[in-house]
């Protein structure tokens, strides 16, 4: 019985104790749980900052809900919900305070501009926690909203199943229904995000700014990412093959391989490969012809524009506009014979004494001067030498001049250089004014001079011609005003105009080299304006104008048309008469100079004297009779050197040739001496001297240096030297005749001819010519000359003598013997 009573189950009843939560929500603020709608498993997030390890499992929450359904009433359930809301709000406040703390920390780090690597890891963790807490708050809020609709359902179901459902070891029907309701709510509204817990990484300053910024679109990229993006873009561009550009290539007559590659923007190696395909082996520095260059360019896909080499000078061609033309001063050239008073006339016109500095009163080179008259008008005069050696210089002067003044001495009349000057002026088509000088001398005849001019078709105005003839006296300054008026009248009739605008151009009057100043060039500007710093090309010389000096020695900065100036800066000495032009840059000037040098070289080769076949045989055998006189000529100005060369090359050179090793402007140098020593040459200096070192070297090497100040003395001496080098002329001089009357045979001597001197004299050892019936049968020398038995040196006319010939005994009675001597005479050119 007792046993039965003990094992009898007790009836389930409600206790008096009140249902309560064992843990407060304060301890749950460190951790929150939510339901994954799909897997129905718990996703747990822990905060490292709070250090709480509290975890609420899904089973505990469900059991708690079951007990709540059994024991709690509606008021108790509402109280729970309010507590949950407070917990959610408290969690949000904690997260907000943490974010504000991090913001302050970031601002402090930004202002201090210091490294923040220790804070960067915490910041990343805080950012993740913030995201997690936001998700948790959203889930809690949604659960609360759903639970507000649950109490009514709970009350109904509690009444139906409160008594029926067993509670021990079982879940109540209300708990099951609540679980289903929660599952529906989770399926419909709550989707728990999947959160990955990664290892924290170090943050940079830019990342902090990005986390704290509100506008995600305005975030700045890190420098490393920008750098990586740029490198990626570069690699992308490098991997893409650039599109080839095809050009129009300008090809001259001759072009270098490297220049052709540059013109096409191709690699030199590619150009060389194309040349090899064409069978041409060339490197980058070698030149090829136009046709080959065109084939290479065409094969590479480029178009070709062929130009001639002479096209480089096209930049020098320019036309002046009519509205730019202005009146300019006339350029007057003074010509005439030696010592007729050309320089004295210029002295009188510009009131200077130039003639005093000229050797012997003879002008040695061209001078250009500008004279300003009383009314302000100007005249430019060019003085040319009167010696015949300067005919080329006079012809150049006639080409650049507007008016020619022919100076004729009233007491001397028309001479050779006067006629030559008239011919130059006529050939140039330049108006002529005749100035009859020295009318102050007694016993002069002006009419005779005018009549001589008529012979050369120079007819004065008084005789119906168009030439103005003005009698003057340069020494007494008579009628100089009339001469100036005549010049200005002719200039006005010609309407001389030029444009002072644009690049300058003109003519080289003279050039020289001066120690300490370099190359000095006298030029005459014909158009445009020349300024300091302009780059000019004159012949094959070029350079930048460094300094300009006028005819009075004053430095100027610009020169207008008809103004003669002396400039410094050319790299070489140009020739008198060369045209000069201003170009844009030094490259243009260099290209033009190189082109002109090639032309001059080709011309020199084409006109070089060719040796005859006989001369070549003589040289090959070593028996050449042609002699050479090597010379080195140095002068003070280029025009004088040219005049000397022109005169020397006119000398006859049949038996001897004049060889000019070197000619130039400037003093005699050591290199000139070395060249003269190596070639056994004579150095000729015209108005220049040798330096101390050059003199020492000349004495040591025994080099002959000769100085001259007058050109015709130099020419005469060179002519004499050449004549002395010629072989002498051998001439026969007849001295007598002998008639053979008897033949004697003498033992050990041979035949002796008894003779009678019929004419002249006979000398021992003289040359003889044996004639028989007026035919020469022997020519030799006398071996013996005796009178009776004595040897004598000579026998005169009317005396008898005995004679014998060397190595010849075929003599007969009646033969005639001519006696003569061989005389040598010096040859002259």
UniProtKB/Swiss-Prot annotation:
UniProt-annotated stretches for the region G2: 361-365
Keyword Methyltransferase recorded: no
Domain tr-type G stretches: 327-497
Localisation per UniProt entry: Cytoplasm
UniProt-listed PROSITE patterns: G_TR_2, IF2
Region (G4): 437-440
Similarity annotation: Belongs to the TRAFAC class translation factor GTPase superfamily. Classic translation factor GTPase family. IF-2 subfamily.
This protein's name: Translation initiation factor IF-2
Taxonomic source organism: Rickettsia akari (strain Hartford)
Source taxonomy: Bacteria, Pseudomonadati, Pseudomonadota, Alphaproteobacteria, Rickettsiales
